[in-house]
Amino acid sequence: MGGNKMNILFTSSGRRVTLIKKFKEVFEQVGIKGKIFTADLKETAPTSYFSDKHFIVPRVNEEGYINELLKICRSEMINLIIPLIDTELILMANNSEVFEGIGVKVLVSSMELNKIANNKKYTYNFFVSNNIPTPRVYSDEEIERKEYQFPLLIKPYDGSSSKGVTKIMNEKELEFFKEYISNAMIQEYVSGEEYTIDVMVDFYGNIKTIVPRLRIETRAGEVSKGVTKKDFDIIQAAETVIKALPNPIGCITLQCFKKEDGQITFIEINPRFGGGIPLSIEAGANFPLWTIKMCQGEVFIDKDFNWRGNLTMLRYDEAIFMEIV
């Protein structure tokens, strides 16, 4: 995958329009000859109107999904696949060698890392075993013996996008939500400034940049207002997490709280482009360019922290209008 030719396929592209636009901008800026393709379950995915070609594919968990992607890769001479949702990361990691067999790279971390990230119990165990501060999770026995203090946080250990995450204030709420939320995990409630951290890592674990973003406001688990912060305590803590992870590749998104006393406590790992990545890119952290370069064989030797701090993003909705016959 050398030279200035590259075709990229974004899977489960959905509403990630700005990310698609940013990659197309880099293509134009550096003279990449190629196309940006998208694939999604729906023909009405907004990204379909901004990519060069859109493909309707089965659900990620349906038989035939991988075969359909392989067909697209062969017909469109795809060089790189970038999966964009949590639910397909393990599947893509498990099939990365199949794609490599036809000359296609998949921007996905190791199977082991994706299993850690996909199950919040495994995420918690990873943090604890590596002495990385994280909110305490209570065992069933501790809950039974009432060895906790309110408020608590309850969430499904296999959930995503903050679905089912609920603050618990008393025993009545705890009893209700234990029954209401399947696969519930109960942990101490942590307050403070909440950050998302975008980290770029090459195929050999070398870090290019780390960008903390303060989450000012969220909607459906995705940041709607945020600001970049050159907080080197958070940057150093994030580097510790990345170095402990098994074979991280590409954009790794971490989440943490910074408490009033300055302690940084991590809560989540998402080994993919996060929804708020356009803020980091706009600040000067060129994730699209670095993605292209690493897939062309570049190894990250020097870190790049030449991005703007205190850049604020205020997101809003735009609409596409069409006639569907």
Across the structure, where does each feature detected by a protein language model lie?
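ATP-binding N-terminal substructure of ATP-dependent carboxylate-amine bond-forming enzymes
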Residues: M1-L107
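Short, charged, surface-exposed secondary-structure boundary motifs
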Residues: S48, G64-N67, K115-N119, G164-V165, ...
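Active-site nucleotide/adenylate-binding loops and adjacent lid/helix of ATP-dependent enzymes
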Residues: M111-E193, F203-N206, F232, Q236
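Protein kinase-like catalytic core scaffold
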Residues: L152, N206-T209, Q263-E268
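ATP-dependent carboxylate/phosphate-activation module, predominantly the ATP-grasp catalytic core
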Residues: Q187-N247, C251, K258, N270-Q296
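Peripheral (often C-terminal) accessory segments that flank ATP-dependent C-N-forming ligase machineries
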Residues: K259, W290-V325
